UniProtKB/Swiss-Prot annotation:
It comes from the Bacteria. One of its GO terms (biological process) is ribosomal small subunit biogenesis. PANTHER family: SMALL RIBOSOMAL SUBUNIT BIOGENESIS GTPASE RSGA (PTHR32120), SMALL RIBOSOMAL SUBUNIT BIOGENESIS GTPASE RSGA 1, MITOCHONDRIAL-RELATED (PTHR32120:SF11). Residues 100-268 form the CP-type G domain. The gene is rsgA. This is Small ribosomal subunit biogenesis GTPase RsgA. The lineage of its organism: Bacteria, Pseudomonadati, Pseudomonadota, Gammaproteobacteria, Pasteurellales. Keywords: Cytoplasm, GTP-binding, Hydrolase, Metal-binding, Nucleotide-binding, Ribosome biogenesis, RNA-binding, rRNA-binding, Zinc. Zn(2+) binds at C292, C297, H299, C305. It comes from Haemophilus ducreyi (strain 35000HP / ATCC 700724). The keyword rRNA-binding applies. GTP binds at N156, K157, I158, D159, G210, Q211, S212, G213, V214, G215, K216, S217, S218. It is an enzyme of class 3 (hydrolase). Its EC number is 3.6.1.-. GO terms for cellular component: cytoplasm. Its cofactor is Zn(2+).
Amino acid sequence: MSKHRLTQNQQRRINANHHKKITRSKFEWQDDMLGEIQAGTIVTRHAKHADVEAENGEIIRCNLRRTLKNVVVGDHVSWRKGSQQLQGISGVIEAVYPRHNELSRPDYYDGIKVMASNIDQIIIISAVMPVLSLNIIDRYLVICENAGIPALIVLNKIDLLSEQERQHVQQQLAIYENIGYQTLCLSANTGENMDKLDRYLANGTSIFVGQSGVGKSSLINQLLPEVHAITGAISDISGLGQHTTTASRLYHLPQGGNLIDSPGIREFGLWHLTPEQITLGYCEFQTILGNCKFRDCKHNTDPGCAIKHAVEKGLINPIRFENYHRLIESRDETKSQRHFRT
């Protein structure tokens, strides 16, 4: 007799019930077993626990109070240390302080998922293999603009390019430099321009984002050799990288600054954003918006569109304009196909 394969929803219900059983049987801290409230920062988020860095640099694995539903790497928290370690846990997180900002992405089942918080800079990692996608870069930039977090575009694996190919890539990156974004070409393999990346990362907290296979783990191995992040090969079939990071982590860099490494994301969806928010994600549109003939202008075939007129005059790059409409269209298609919880 053949075995029936569980559907995604069935598997999720089984996992949820298993988690509830574990939670009910999990040790509960009593108040008299806990010390004074301290300040700390979340440096690793696990499924059921989180690692907190105390002000003295000590890393403590903690339970979360049941009232805390969404704790992420980068959060500043208040926590209390236990009188002893119990079941591998040494403390409990009591509360999360207000966030300066947060980086979120949509999840097909769980609505908006916050990935990290209190970020000073988003490092968008792209690569020349299998192909440099400006559409994906634009997708990330829309997220950065809506989150209000500065972005640095990093192109890895340039050692694979010929001199002619490098010149072509520089022309593509100039599209972003001309509208105020910083870009950097480097190679984690040869170390080319890694010193420049060090300088960009030296202040504040940065986060690496990018599709799997662009070399985020290889870059971390260069920046932090002692970490030995697992690197993955490119799939010969799909051309996509294999996921190599399983949990978001915050690292302290030797030259100063902090780095958050997040799991590889093959599709950073935008269907949680409105078309207006995607439009606001294009920084070069901002001085022109409001000048269209019609207030509900879709910036496509509408008569009197100021954005389209700016493209025709060479004030807005046509590749960016084309990608803008591709993002709007892909958002509408994806949202109509998925039951998305907001």
